[in-house]
């Protein structure tokens, strides 16, 4: 079978990583087309990859006959139009989060995809492909902790881009814990509340940081998340699940734990998301490529998962303003098997 020909749209940090990943570490695929809103950047990336060329218009890149599948690493505001083009051209697509930037358009994408014979959209929630998260999921599903009752999460970044505001902590950071909650517990989130502690003096004036998110699932499980994106330290992601017969935690350390001055200890902390989750990204893309080549098109989070995350985050942004718990309202999930197709 010939290699899957992939168009990578958006070659900033994430997109350029995907080009390098597909070119050097993924089997059964190659990058045939790249696109970016900065054409010179796309031309530079294309010149470094054999058999790759830059296409100026992202919709032309999707429609290109030398493209079998698409990776979207473009700004979220462009996703709706690009996803619609992928559906129109029946091109499987790996879409980095968010699915779209609002709940209504995310739901419309879900409904349109459900009208097709096979799903085409996979959403890039990479933690589902991380070795530690997969082990934690297996532990829960195997019943070793008994009924999971509570989950505690930490999500810290050393810093954020200049355009970041308080709502993006919910939409860009908390969204990962939202998907982790749904993935680990296998149920939807019923409500979300954002609590605002004393803000970090080092945070930009327009950013309320840290924030504490409190999620409640439909069965009543409690999840709390510390979101602190201006620590100035490192990238820290930890998750602890407490069950009726014990608990389990991941993300405690990276590398050597050392003893130094009396009464202290320490180790290495991942400086960024690529160091912490680089292997998960590799696994995610390889499994997606394998699924597309096999004709199933997805092996991971679906368009519905992207929509559900958007709905929870929308409730979170509302709670950020009010400080109160906000219910999450989800539409009925479309059933592909019951939809009549012309």
Set out the residue ranges of the language-model regions.
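N-terminal Rossmann-like dinucleotide-binding module
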Residues: 1-49
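Conserved SAM-binding strand-loop segment of SAM-dependent methyltransferases
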Residues: 51-58
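Beta-strand-loop-alpha-helix segment that lines the small-molecule cofactor/substrate pocket
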Residues: 69-76, 80-125
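Mid-domain beta-loop-alpha active-site segment that forms a flexible
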Residues: 124-132, 155-190, 208, 217, ...
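Contiguous beta-strand/loop segments that form the cofactor/metal-binding neighborhood of enzyme cores
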Residues: 172, 176-255, 282-295, 331-342
